[in-house]
């Protein structure tokens, strides 16, 4: 029953049929993974893709947590003997955790409040009398409730107690809270002020020293910037419920909302002034504080979710970047005083040689000889150069060496070295290269990530890759869960070579665990290469369920069965046998003859187990066995002579690589150790709502330099090449980027019109 209700809710959100969601719930509950369901159970789910299934999974967790909480609350209220049919219906009807907690608020066990103490002192009848019959005079009526033994010393104490009883009652009314919350969510303004004396210390938050903005309009990067400022003791944040009220106005519109909700009319009766005070205090002392805390938390939660989504999309683009392929590669980890670390790997990524050279400290000739020798010795095809400190100098040095090579010149490529140091110090790197200096391991990672970014980057904790917006400010548990899902989806979308994959890569395959992945590697080391997928069943602790989940994503090149190199799941091999019988072809002939496959009618091969989606997927695999969804390998060519920010001039048109996409634009590496910012307004001639619709991390783009601020190391770029450049000493309505190479975090700014820095982050 519960699964059916959940299916209805999620189906409406995804605009699909409830039976699709119901099937997905059953599959997930049976231990199937999202990649497996998306790829091999399309008939059951009606073709839900991995993006839809990830949303479904998140909502399923939320709604099941909601249901568990609902049952706990119902039990608690029932045990108190206060569960009415009306309340039960309201609790069953809500699909919001916030609303559920509002309904529970009056019944939630709590420490004795002032209101409860007043009730125990016998003041509830006074509160009800004055509220419901305002013709009574408060002072004279309260006299009969004075009781020194109960702590009610005089009529003032009695009236104060009665007021508190009503305040607590109204502040726990779910309907009243919903009305005021709705108004504040639409109309309240967040106010940010600098704490006196913190101006110098908090200079980086200067755009928020006196900032106001409609709560509903605050974008995630500005919200997180303000919260960071508050956490660092620089800013004070508050909500202004009445931004349009005249200065000096003492009454909030929220008091009017409360009055209307309670259906109170003031007609000049004796208790009206007292009742008006009850409403004012209910708002100022109870409701406003409660809802400000809640709405601030909601703003932060929403901002964190958006930031996590940005990180996930950037990570996807980075992991799915086109591999350079199986080529002999030299990795250079640039450095000045400490030297350039050099690692040589073969076309499979196996480490062959390492050294350290010092081309930037007066030993260039010696370094040239060393690099030239390694290139000749190992027939180097690619040189991967990390993009950190001394990157351009190292690139220029490498190109000078290449000029002396007559033929088969290697290609130099600058790659992101984000996370390389994390890999170098990791347990996995230590186990892989126990006798190799930590600094040299980074060069190995740089070389390998050019050959195959996905295979190498899975060895690094996703958060360390550094393509996120405020990743250190968000909920780390949610961030880890989201990024793990991204890595899992990317790995399974590409597939894994069973005979060469590392344990970290294997661990990301559907159905795998770290233990099973290590068992596969150990089995491979002891028994040699896998010749078939079925051999996986011999791996210790890899049972039928794990095999079912992982087999289709494992690839075996040149194995016993050509299908093992494809994305066809072993369970569907009988379908291929039918196709072979129908075409009178061998599997080798069929897999190299796309024309024959295209002439087949998929409906001919449908049976009770395998429907049209599966057969169509099989056809695609037969046409292009083990096809790689990643794009063609391309690299940016940095301009000669443009190596430092001081080399930039307004109007220059340069080529660069997108390193990070945020909600306010995209950062681009143009080879000067400082990323430039293309503001969202400069991404396209058309209106852009979401920068991710135009660019993604890793894209090669042409940009024009709009503005350069050398002292503050800020660069403003545009992808609208006809856009006018700005003189360096003038103000503009956009920011200048201050994103140094290797730095993974930006400070958000606001959109105050007189601030060059602030407006880009609007």
From Swiss-Prot:
Region described as Disordered: 724-762
Alphabetized GO MF terms: mRNA binding; structural constituent of ribosome
Keywords tagged on the record: RNA-binding
Pfam families in alphabetical order: HHH_3, HHH_9, S1, Tex_central_region, Tex_N, Tex_YqgF
Basic and acidic residues bias spans: 724-736
Example GO biological process: translation
Protein name in the entry: Uncharacterized protein HI_0568
Domain S1 motif: from-to ranges: 651-720
Gene Ontology CC entries for this record: cytosol
Stretches with biased composition (Polar residues): 751-762
InterPro entries membership: HHH_9, NA-bd_OB-fold, Ribos_protein_bS1-like, RNaseH-like_sf, RuvA_2-like, S1_domain, S1_Tex, Tex-like_central_region
CDD domains registered for this protein in UniProt: S1_Tex (cd05685)
Keyword ATP-binding recorded: no
Cited Gene3D superfamilies: Nucleic acid-binding proteins, RuvA domain 2-like, Tex N-terminal region-like, Tex RuvX-like domain-like, YqgF/RNase H-like domain
